[in-house]
């Protein structure tokens, strides 16, 4: 039997493998990701987690896509976004000019899409008789002035959007050392208030509108307080109607910020949230959609 030389064959096989590897390396990283297909991750302000979970669940059921949700405090979310831990984020504010410069240096222009109006809610133990609270009293408490109606303010995280929002409102740079309690999540805040009378919790309202099965018994033990705005006379609860009429004083817009720089799932998910289906999900969640979904009314010519 004639034997073929082994070395040329091995050499040829090696060249073939190198060629194949080079072709694989030259493929675009995002080749398998489109606006409605593939996988990605989304950074989420923890105070907004429930509405994002609802949106992602439906999006994944409709498209061949997988979105990993990474809940963090607002400060941690923005830091992770700037470090490319993920290139999509959902926040209760836009990026400021300094934050946008980080992406400009990478030749990426963040695309910001507003999709809902949320609210910061004050909650108390259900055993508390008072269901009203004046925003001025809360501001004064944040400035170190004691108030007989407020035993303590309970926040989710020192780096959270609720803390940043309330500090900006009060004109303070940091929370006072006395009468302030903080945890890691909104769930922990709700549970602490449910177990302690006299405490006022500060949470994202979407944690209260459609609580999980685990949280429902706990939410049943708290009261969502109606708030009187600074310089106002009437009290308003954080309902969809009051948000729409701009009566509730602690409303805030929600944004999805896409820093992918290409046509990927960030673009597709943003379009979904701001579109018909996403806005219906927002409406059902208890938040205020940017665009009120239309209703199809069938008119019958004859009544049977």
Regions found by a protein language model. Name each.
Residues 4-5, 22-64, 74-75, 79-82, ...:
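Exported/periplasmic ABC-transporter solute-binding proteins
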Residues 9-20:
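Bacterial N-terminal signal peptides
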Residues 88, 95, 110-113, 118-120:
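Short, glycine-/small- and polar/acidic-enriched structural segments
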Residues 75-106, 211:
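Pocket-flanking alpha-helical
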Residues 1-11:
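Bacterial N-terminal signal peptides that target proteins for export
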